[in-house]
Amino acid sequence: MMYIKNTIQDFVIKFKTNDLNMGEIDFTAEENESSLPVNLNGEIRFFYSHLILNDHPTFYGTFFIQIVESQDLNEILSGWRVQNDTAWHDEYIIFAERNGDVLFCDTRNITSPVYGSIQKRNFIISGSLADFLDVFCSAIEIEQSKYDGDGTDDDFNFREDFLGDIDFMLKGKLKDVEAKGFKQFFFG
């Protein structure tokens, strides 16, 4: 559990370092389980029981996502739980949203593997929530420190060198199929 704890703490730090981010994310060492409306286990349970989330926390920039607050977990899931939908399981927990697409964990596995879903088509992004948080924070670090918070050119297309740097980082941290999923979710 050390790895997930460290990646969550880094996630909070990355959130706080960008003034353009909205809402509030804080880490708490004390387990805060009173407010979990859905059944969680593994890394996603650790995530929600050690984060204080307020005012629709949203990361700004290329890797824009809005984190789902624990009290909203049921509500966001209700739109995805459709009868006779074999592609969607009750064990899927949506933890972030981006323009109507979502990131979710499969709680059937203790590591909480992360998937992206674009127009209800699901694909793997990482073998664990900790791995996702690690690459997400690394991607933000690249965008903020090397590209001054903007990986696009004058025509708002992603810069080739920016995409290359993200690609290189992903190759070092994820399986190829996962890296492809990460890029599909954030770059289309």
State where each predicted segment sits.
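A short, terminal or domain-edge coil/loop segment
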Residues: 71-80, 111-115, 119, 145-155
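A surface-exposed partner-binding patch
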Residues: 1-104, 147, 168-188
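Short loop/turn segments at secondary-structure transitions that flank enzyme active sites
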Residues: 54, 101, 111, 139-142
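Short, solvent-exposed loop/turn segments at secondary-structure junctions
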Residues: 99-102, 109-110, 120-122
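Compact, glycine/acidic-enriched structural inserts
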Residues: 113-146
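Mixed-charge (acidic/basic) macromolecular-recognition segments
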Residues: 137-168
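Structured loops at beta-to-helix junctions and adjacent beta-edge loops in soluble globular domains
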Residues: 96-98, 108, 117, 128
